Amino acid sequence: DTERQRITKLLQNKGYYKFNKDFLVYQADTARNTYLVDLTLRLLPYQRRKEDLPRKHRQYKVGEVNFLADDEIMSVQEGTLEEFDSLRYKGYSMYYKGKAFLRPQVLVDFNRIRPGELYSEQDVQNTYSNLGRLRALKYSNIRFREVNGENGTQLDAYVFLAKNKNKSMAFEVEGTNSAGDLGAAASVSFQHRNVFKGSETFMMKVRGAYEAITGLGVASQDYVNDNYMEYGIESSLNFPQFMFPFLSSNFKKKIRATSEVGLKFTSQVRPEFSRTLASASWSYKWTDRKRMQHRLDLVDVNYVYMPRKSSAFQEYLDSMSLRNSALKASYENQLVVRTGYSFTYNSAGNAMMRTPTKNSYSIRANIEEAGNLLYVASKLVHPNPKDGEDYVLANIPFAQYVKADFDFAKNFMIDPRNSFVFHIGVGVAYPYGNSKMLPFEKRYFSGGANSVRGWSVRSLGPGVYKGSEDGRMDFINQAGDIKLDLNIEYRTHLFWKLNGAAFVEDRKS
């Protein structure tokens, strides 16, 4: 049956619109009186009904391609489209009532059914997939009507488009109780799914929070208030195409890409400190042949500024610096301006979403850099800084480093219930120029569900370091600039949806 499906798919992509696997039958011959069977694959002629005369299978070409902004039409007959306004654009006909809600160029770019070409079922499925990425559409439906053209039988295509609701708003309210301190938070979000009539999605969210803090004690004389306030705003604009100047339209049509610009700002004011967090990003995502995924972060800016820390809070952070360096790192000024690219490949393709049935492997790679353009620009403006001084932007020294990671995993299927998985991961990061060490969140660490699972996150240091005499651990012994992961895991299905695993791991960082 697999061979019949393969041949059917091949013929349907070569213009044979009405072909299906029922026209392919096998004949078995055992007349030679052996243990072998001769199989002959026969092609039956086209016959719609048993009483019809058999005839050759016809090859169809696409005639007209029409887009209709109406999903309620059950069939297209003569005069059906007379009540619609129409527009002719680059050989395609657009029909709509009132105003067109999508630009004609968008429909042409996302369509794969071309007038004058042989009918292809793959082109139809690709068109469905492309239109499904347009958030301005609720759904789409493609129908064909057989007509007699100049060069034989043709198919006119009708692409029906159901408009989605463009605008939506959401309001959220929540109450909090942190160790007896009562508070409340509220947020309002707005989304527009078709800002420029190209299915661009714009989102904006505003959030505010308040909490009354009690029990500040004698240290309260160093505090400016006795409550916690937070407010923030974030927004994003998503394009369903690869938006970049100087790229040809053919390139944009080949890849299923999205482009996104994002901005975020948050201000936090507590008795102990004030903190400002801001970020900006411009990124691209695209897939290739359903197995490969790409992400390009053209620019990704993360900014943390601490304009105020009380002396009591600073003393607390200093006392915790050796016990919990991650806590202290969260309350330090930071500026990272990075560019990165990541690549993911899975040999199973869409099958990875189901229970694996055969051997497969996956590859993940990532490379990023930060601060190089800022460093060059700073050198041009101020070529000779004082000894020991770092270049700054917005009064914060910016990070400068390069980092690369590579992960490979191989899945060996023993049977449908049991498998072995082998994994190796390597990574290296190097700070230089304006940085003497990596930003804390960019360092490698061990422990946790995605690392050596026998230890909790960041609890496993390199080598056999035992810490200081009082048992405290310094951050440099819990994170590193190089990593090496090795993992062998046996997986088995126990019962229902419960799976079990036994693993052996080694990690250096």
Regions found by a protein language model. Give the residues of each.
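C-terminal outer-membrane beta-barrel translocator/porin domains of Gram-negative envelope proteins
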Residues: 80-83, 92, 176-179, 295-493, ...
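Short beta-strand/helix segments in adaptor/scaffold domains that form protein-protein interfaces
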Residues: 17, 52, 255, 350-354, ...
